[in-house]
Amino acid sequence: MGKAKAPRQLKDNEAKAVARTLRVSPQKLNLVASMIRGKKVNAALADLTFSRKRIAGTVKKTLESAIANAENNHDLDVDALIVAEAYVGKSIVMKRFHVRGRASRIEKPFSHLTIVVREVAEKGEAA
């Protein structure tokens, strides 16, 4: 006997992917996340491909995972997907000493990234 399956937290037309413990500050990651928020997934992938930010490759990989989850797990149409949510959370902060006995310490922040894609109806279609 196991626990009952938890109810799904997303709507039926949504899929999600999460990247945890990314070695980048939340502020820098949020710059890239806000760049794709609200866009169609094809446009978002193109923007991430040509972005010069270091973390853009990891964000692209997470977005591709969300698209694959939508297609394979939830049977959503890939061409009708938009990036509904892309938000960043704080993770751990790795601390170390400065070299040569300096008095302060270096803090290396980590982040979490969550991307939710949503299937939307095309505007040209009649219901």
From Swiss-Prot:
GO MF: rRNA binding; structural constituent of ribosome
Pfam family name, one: Ribosomal_L22
Keyword Endoplasmic reticulum: no
Chain ranges passing through the membrane: none
Subunit comment: Part of the 50S ribosomal subunit.
Family per similarity comment: Belongs to the universal ribosomal protein uL22 family.
Described purpose of this protein according to its UniProt entry: This protein binds specifically to 23S rRNA; its binding is stimulated by other ribosomal proteins, e.g. L4, L17, and L20. It is important during the early stages of 50S assembly. It makes multiple contacts with different domains of the 23S rRNA in the assembled 50S subunit and ribosome. The globular domain of the protein is located near the polypeptide exit tunnel on the outside of the subunit, while an extended beta-hairpin is found that lines the wall of the exit tunnel in the center of the 70S ribosome.
Protein's name in the database: Large ribosomal subunit protein uL22
